Design a protein with these regions (language model features):
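Extracytoplasmic
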Residues: 68-70, 90-92, 96, 100-101, ...
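Active-site SXXK
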Residues: 94-119, 143, 210, 279
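Mid-domain, small-residue-enriched loop/turn segments at the edges of structured enzyme/sensor domains
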Residues: 132, 139-140, 156-214
Length: 311
């Protein structure tokens, strides 16, 4: 089944009905490997002769990767300009981005000098958090790797509402709704150091939109500096296969309600020489089947790796 897709911009509802949920986070391992130096920012002064047609959607049966789990997958292969999607209904449904939003907050903070990756340590308040790795002074790279919510809560507050809204509008990031800035809708957690609009609150995005945003950040038409992209690549690097020249970059995210995970993500991009794939894998909870961001990550890596083999 092939159909054309029309992309919509952000809307700003003053208030929307959302399920209230708590938050958990996934953590990413980072191999010590050299980062690709292929720039993606369009040279200054270059213009497009005409607008490109909207990419088509091709529906795929990737059920074997999910093994009965409730999930969706989106791959956008830049060279053939098609979205390959498993479970289209779920892939077009918006959910909380949770810790995948650390890609966006890192992007904005790095681009605007709010975070300097070489001088990025923030002091721990002394409060004991559930994740032991957060109970100390922590720098940007470690905060990204461990999904340290208190660190990013501070960074996002320094970015501020006005700049955050402008950036999300420019990226067309889901519903772009930051109205619940402090995350008060999140009744599962009253600690405001660990809540925010991006954690089971007002901000929502679909798996397809996640892949689209990755292309806007790391694609040829990116409006972000190569230096910022390079810093993000360093913390997002998840797996590198020297034999196939495949590098996979991504970030986990997980949100919970009443102690049980309800949203699990892994999103990012993969690179092979001059080619690039933007992807997202999402898992949603169903009765009797646990989900995790680690499982979403495992599925994404396997799916992307197998897709590349078929080139």
């Amino acid at each position: 089944c092939v159909c054309l897709v029309i992309l919509a911009g952000c809307s700003h509802p003053a208030d929307t009905n959302h399920k209230e949920a708590g938050a958990g986070t996934g953590s990413d391992g980072k191999p010590s490997a050299e980062i690709s130096s292929m720039p993606t920012k369009k040279p200054e002064g270059e213009t497009l002769a005409e607008a490109s047609p909207e990419p088509a959607i091709v529906e795929e049966d990737w059920s074997e990767y999910f093994d009965g789990r409730n999930g969706a997958a989106v791959l956008y292969h830049a060279s053939d300009a098609r979205y390959r999607i498993y479970n289209k209904k779920l892939a077009l449904s918006r959910r909380s981005p949770c810790s995948t939003f650390k890609i966006i907050s890192s992007l904005i903070a790095l681009e605007n000098g709010i975070v300097d990756s070489d001088h990025s340590t923030r002091r721990w308040s002394g409060e004991q958090f559930w994740n032991e790795s957060w109970n100390r002074d922590i720098d940007f790279r470690e905060a990204f790797r461990t999904s340290c919510v208190w660190y990013y809560r501070e960074v996002i507050d320094e970015i501020g509402k006005k700049q955050m809204q402008q950036q999300l509008d420019a990226l067309r990031y889901g519903n772009c709704d930051i109205s619940d800035w402090k995350g008060r809708r999140n009744k599962n957690n009253s600690n405001r150091a660990l809540t925010g609009f991006w954690i089971e609150s007002s901000l929502k995005i679909s798996p397809k939109e996640q892949a689209e945003v990755m292309e806007r950040i790391f694609g040829e038409e990116s409006m972000y500096s190569w230096e910022t992209q390079k810093e993000l690549r360093q913390v997002m690097l998840t797996k590198r296969n020297k034999k196939t020249a495949l590098s996979i970059y991504g970030k986990t995210g997980m949100g919970a309600k009443q102690g049980e995970a309800v949203d699990a993500w892994f999103t990012g991009f993969a690179e092979m020489e001059e080619d690039r794939i933007y992807y997202c894998v999402y898992l949603g909870r169903i009765e009797g089947r646990n989900i995790s961001s680690d499982k979403a990550k495992e599925i994404a890596i396997e799916l992307v790796s197998d897709y590349v083999k078929g080139f």
